[in-house]
A protein has these predicted regions:
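Cytochrome P450
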Residues: 1-409
Length: 409
């Protein structure tokens, strides 16, 4: 399938199968457990020799890796549409999530009213709450001399920040809601509907209850007010619920992965840890590098609306393509020493937060959250390491997650 290699020797089918367990150029599958275990190696092999790979999974899809191609596909929504969803082999009956799974003018109408509620100025108001929540969680385990970072901190903090502070969801509901959102993101396709339905029902009721209360001028009120798609077409109720579900799914697990990966890196690299502890003003730049190197979105899909060619490979109208954001930011064509974490890198080019009209709406909050947490963590726990004999555990689908990280201090 792939007629798009760079200059050096392209591995044969037999060599790929021996190394990766399958021909990752012509039979790639991001749900393959072996991809989870060889994540970096597969991404780098695609970048080196096959920037447009093919998957035989289900109806099939193309896997677009190279930096410039990722930018092109992400920005050209007219050719690469979101209107049929961002996941290949979409289960029948799975509701579309607005504004992610639609095109302008629907998408742009929603982003116009939502973006102001996640602007840098607005999210800065959450900084003290993030500081307080971070220290409250650390207080629970600091005296123990160690923790399992994901269970004790990483899976909790983003939910607190988003649900409690941004949406105002009752704190008692957070554990269940965070777990359900995680399963909706990481469960196999055939099980995702169950968890999406649970989250959908909860947030549908949450919106109905909020509609009975006086307006607060927040994002929830903006969603309740809805948008006009045309002069004669208002957004229906199910679209309003869909918007809240979409933002919920995007606001939790993604931040957890970048944060956990940053903590793992600092645990294993004492020079970087000491530098950032002594220079907290440099944390913002370091967070960009962590986001570049540890992208939580493995790939997001589009449907091709016309025949095109990408990196020498013909893509037909109706074909499904996956934008491999996870690969693009480590493309050596766009980043020098791309496979190395360099917290001093300036600038830090990456597409971890996407590109084009569907660029991550919560990127400002994610940046603030990760930087603030790491600054507070280093104040309280300046020396820490990965527990000897333990090994971080990961899960990979269209998102990348870390499920276990044991650290000691």
């Amino acid at each position: 399938m792939a007629n798009n290699a760079v200059a050096d020797k392209v591995p044969t089918k037999a060599e790929l199968e021996a190394r990766f367990g399958r021909d990752i150029f012509n039979d790639f599958d991001y749900n393959d457990p072996r991809f989870n275990d060889q994540f970096n190696e597969v991404l780098e092999e695609h970048l080196a020799h096959c920037p447009v790979a093919w998957s035989n999974d289900g109806h099939g899809y193309w896997w677009i890796s190279r930096n410039e191609d990722v930018r092109r596909v992400a920005q050209d929504w007219q050719t690469f549409s979101n209107a049929k969803g961002y996941a290949p082999n979409r289960p029948e009956g799975l509701p579309l999530l607005y504004p992610e799974e639609c095109d302008p003018p629907y998408q742009s109408a929603w982003r116009k009213v939502l973006n102001p509620h996640l602007s840098p100025k607005v999210v800065a108001n959450y900084e003290q709450a993030i500081i307080d929540d971070t220290n409250e969680l650390i207080d629970r385990f600091i005296a123990k001399g160690g923790c399992e970072f994901i269970a004790d901190f990483g899976s909790i903090l983003p939910g607190l920040v988003f649900f409690k502070n941004v949406l105002g969801v009752p704190v008692d509901d957070l554990p269940w809601l965070v777990e359900s959102a995680e399963l909706a993101n990481f469960a196999p396709n055939e099980e995702r509907q169950i968890h999406i339905d649970k989250v959908w029902a909860y947030l549908d009721n949450f919106l109905k209850q909020r509609a009975k209360l006086p307006p607060r001028g927040d994002m929830v009120d903006a969603i309740l007010a809805g948008v006009k798609y045309t002069e004669d077409q208002d957004s229906p109720w199910e679209h309003k619920v869909s918007v809240l579900v979409d933002i919920t799914f995007g606001g939790i697990n993604t931040t957890t992965y970048v944060l956990a990966s940053a903590v793992k890196h600092l645990a294993e690299n004492p020079e970087d840890r000491a530098f950032l502890a002594a220079n907290p003003d440099k944390m913002v730049g370091a967070v960009e590098e962590f986001a570049r190197m540890f992208p939580p979105i493995v790939g997001m899909g589009r449907s091709c609306t016309r025949d095109v060619e990408i990196a020498g490979t013909p893509i037909k109208e109706g074909d499904f393509v996956m934008i491999a954001y996870s690969a693009s930011s480590r493309d050596p064509r766009g980043v020098e020493n791309a496979s190395v974490v360099d917290i001093h890198r300036e600038p830090v080019p990456h597409y971890t937060f996407g590109a084009g009209p569907h660029r991550c709406i919560g990127s400002n909050l994610a940046r603030l959250e990760i930087a603030t947490v790491l600054q507070e963590w280093l104040k309280r726990i300046p020396e820490f390491s990965v527990k000897p004999g333990s090994k971080p555990e990961y899960i990979t689908g269209f998102l990348r997650g870390m499920t276990k990280l044991e650290i000691l201090w």
